[in-house]
Amino acid sequence: MKSIKSAGDRFFAVIAYIIVILSIMSTTVMWNYLKGAFIPIGTYRYLLLAISLLLVLVTNSYNFKDLSFITLIICYLLVFIFFSQINPFKYFSTFCMPLTASLLIVFVYYQHGKGNLLLASYANIVLIVAGVSLFFYFFGSILGLRIGAIDTNYYWADNPHFTTSYCYLYFHQPLQDQIYLGHHVIRNTGIFTEAPGYTLFLLDGLIIELFVKKSKTFWRIGLILVTLLTTLSATAILLGALAVLISFLQYLQAQGKLNLKIVIPVFLLLLVLGVIVIRIRKSGGSSYSVRVDDLRIGLTLWSQNPVFGVGFGNEGALIKMFAFHRANNGLSMGLTTLMATGGLYLALYFLVPFFTTLFAPSRRYLLPISILLLLEIIISNISTNPVYLMAMALLWYAVLNDIREQGAFAGTNYTSLYF
């Protein structure tokens, strides 16, 4: 990122860090679930919406095309209310509000040519969290050094659980530990309640480092990859490996050394092996059973109402179909959850950018990002996650600008100019 010189740059940089922090705080970070936590998660979403509206007013960002698109999306979301059995408050507070805020923030930043500040602030925070978690993971969880350690409780799905906090910057979750090949294995969950939440946080940082930044910084990429390995999430590790592989293939293509006759069969073989590894890795545990049950429930409910689903926030319809007791009332797979409760209508917001990038002039740059974001929502229930919604807003902006200016990304500084 270029050095920040003007007052305007400093303003956008500071606000970018505030936006990223609020977005992360709106997710499943431990501070929201500790005993005595007094700030509701919804508060951060309201603050994000307030900041987005203030940004539009303060910066005079009234681009007709951009605001028309955002208005169209808002109207599209409102129409859903009239055709679906819906929990209005939950729909507005957990989906419409953060989605609208994300679109406004992204469009304001890129209209003023400051979009790189949003991406840089997120990437920097990921690096800080990863570095801190690795330090406490090795010296605290593995070696047993109680550096600023405090034993406390947190509440997940309304049930109390034990955790050890290290200076409130890293949390060892015994509930997340696993038995692998007869050995007790400790997972690095960072500042999150569960390893999957942490892995997605890291993966988004990896996407920025590999596909958004024009120049690669290998120590940053290495730090994220090492941290991903310590989460012991087979799915996330394979996604990280896939991201690195795609980035390497892009490099070979740029050097004119890419032989598709060799690469495509190898790529398909690795993909099949990856699926087999996940199948074997999870088949012995409850995680696999839950995902199979989720797939069954999601497809069954979606078949009942393919267009609008059974109703956003309709947990009763989900609970009635559970094959066994769970710790929470939701599904773990994002796309099937969205299809079941919001139908194809809401799912289109996440699917359209992916299919558009297949034909975009600069699909070479956009398609890897689009594929990885699509895989994220398939494997994890993150359709209301403000960080993920921000990533989708960035993808929408990149796609729309590429359509407006044919070949806009070709031969340009992809990182600093657009996405």
Predicted regions and their residues:
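Helix-loop-helix junctions and helix-breaking kinks within/between transmembrane helices
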Residues: 34-42, 82-99, 188-200, 218-248, ...
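Transmembrane alpha-helical segments and their membrane-water interfaces
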Residues: 55-58, 86-142, 350-354
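A membrane-periplasm/extracellular boundary helix in multi-pass inner-membrane enzymes
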Residues: 135-144, 247-287
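Transmembrane alpha-helices of multi-pass inner-membrane enzymes
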Residues: 49-50, 369-376, 383-419
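Alpha-helical transmembrane segments of multi-pass inner-membrane proteins
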Residues: 120-143, 166-231, 239-249
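Long extracytoplasmic/lumenal interhelical loops at the membrane interface
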Residues: 30-38, 280-342
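Hydrophobic transmembrane alpha-helices and their immediate junctions
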Residues: 213-225, 241-249, 341-377
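Transmembrane signal-anchor hairpin modules in multi-pass inner-membrane enzymes, especially those
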Residues: 1-82, 401-419
